[in-house]
Amino acid sequence: IDLIKKIKALRPDIHVKAFTMVEIDQIVRLAKKPVAEVLAELREAGLDSMPGGGAEIFAERVHKELYPRKLSSDNWVKLAKEIHNNGFKTNCTMMYGMIETIEERVDHLQRLRNLQDETGGFQTYIPLAFHPDNTKLEHIEKPSPTERLRSIAVGRLFLDNIPHIKAYWIMLGLEVAQAALTMGADDLDGTVSQEKIYHEAGASTPQELTRADIHKLIREAGRRPVERNTVYDVITDFSDESDSFEKCTV
């Protein structure tokens, strides 16, 4: 809370987006206060929205085998609902390519869809391909480019009630992320800097891109680059008068 206050004091114009569902759950436990009270204190300090990660796959079978100490799927959904009902927007994710079945992926998407119908609090869906290198599942083959694109397309069709689909280029790879812009994704993410999580798990993508790099990827996919803020308000539309492309946010 003190850190958020200091950030807002220095730059009140900055939108502070922080804390996954798992981290909010931990904060609530440490504070020993009701969720609503913790959220009110975070809002007063200057928290604006949350990334909403930590869902992985909701399947209880996978949860028990791979991450038994993590926030349960039922509690994740319950917490997300309360966060949305308290006025915060979040993203949502699905980690695929571990030991889950196709049916378990569909169940995960259905639960996200149901919650979105109820709260309208998700602004972006981000499918995340599992990178097995340097993990206890390194014997598993990572999702193919085709499977990664299929996950984007299925997400766009299934979750038509969520406004945006993100093609996270660090996870997908540049060529797949570019192709994803024609498969349902409308957000390529930003320039980033020194990403660690996926690179420690074997990702070979660049750790950062320039704005020019991203614009080139988007234009080559037949889309027009539009810089946005966290809540998808347009900051700069980089299209020119000759562009007839659909927009893609960065």
Identify the function of each model-found stretch.
Residues 1-115:
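Conserved Radical SAM active-site core
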Residues 9-10, 31, 110, 116-250:
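Auxiliary Fe-S-binding modules of radical SAM enzymes
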